[in-house]
Curated annotation (Swiss-Prot):
This is Phospholipase A2. GO terms for molecular function: bile acid binding; calcium ion binding; calcium-dependent phospholipase A2 activity; phospholipid binding; signaling receptor binding. Activated by trypsin cleavage in the duodenum. Can also be activated by thrombin or autocatalytically. GO terms for biological process: arachidonate secretion; fatty acid biosynthetic process; lipid catabolic process; phosphatidylglycerol metabolic process; positive regulation of fibroblast proliferation; positive regulation of podocyte apoptotic process. The gene is PLA2G1B. One of its GO terms (cellular component) is extracellular region. Residues 16-22 form a propeptide. It catalyses: a 1,2-diacyl-sn-glycero-3-phosphocholine + H2O = a 1-acyl-sn-glycero-3-phosphocholine + a fatty acid + H(+); 1,2-ditetradecanoyl-sn-glycero-3-phosphocholine + H2O = 1-tetradecanoyl-sn-glycero-3-phosphocholine + tetradecanoate + H(+); 1,2-dihexadecanoyl-sn-glycero-3-phosphocholine + H2O = 1-hexadecanoyl-sn-glycero-3-phosphocholine + hexadecanoate + H(+); 1-hexadecanoyl-2-(9Z-octadecenoyl)-sn-glycero-3-phosphocholine + H2O = 1-hexadecanoyl-sn-glycero-3-phosphocholine + (9Z)-octadecenoate + H(+). It is found in: Secreted. Ca(2+) binds at Y50, G52, G54, D71.
Length: 144
């Protein structure tokens, strides 16, 4: 639920200010690239113990483990001196990437923080595309 509120606020803020999409929306685009026809926020937010904002417990399956790894990657990004908390944090910093077929490529023109975040998102999107989706794990809270 918190993630959906955050997504709604980011959408409103982005639309109102006319700025480029934030990393969350770019992550959505990467998932749609690797899994054409998917609805990432509807399908993955609230899946397992780690997909969505926050996470705890033991991942329920390999797809949930993708989310746990993505969370850990963002934690590492926040430790970089180039990823400041307010401006260049993983949830709001935009980056450049391209999609060709189902292949995502991060731009070599990204700065250090942008490149790190882009790679976190790219690896997670690829991971999602290679793991089965188990409907019984959406939504889930009793195992976390």
């Amino acid at each position: 639920m918190k993630f959906l509120v955050l997504a709604a606020l980011l959408t409103a803020g982005t639309a109102a200010s006319g700025v480029s999409p934030t990393a969350l929306w770019q992550f959505r685009g990467m998932i749609q690239c690797t899994i054409p026809g998917s609805s990432p926020y509807l399908e993955f937010n609230g899946y397992g113990c780690y997909c969505g904002l926050g996470g705890s417990g033991t991942p329920v399956d390999e797809l949930d483990r993708c989310c746990q790894t993505h969370d850990q990657c963002y934690t590492q990004a926040k430790k970089l001196s180039s990823c400041s908390f307010l401006v260049d944090n993983p949830y709001t910093n935009s980056y450049s990437y391209s999609c060709s077929g189902t292949t995502v490529t991060c731009s070599s023109k990204n700065k250090e923080c942008e490149a790190f975040i882009c790679d976190c998102d790219r690896k997670a999107a690829i991971c999602f595309s290679k793991r089965p989706y188990n409907k019984e794990y959406k939504p889930i809270s009793k195992y976390c």
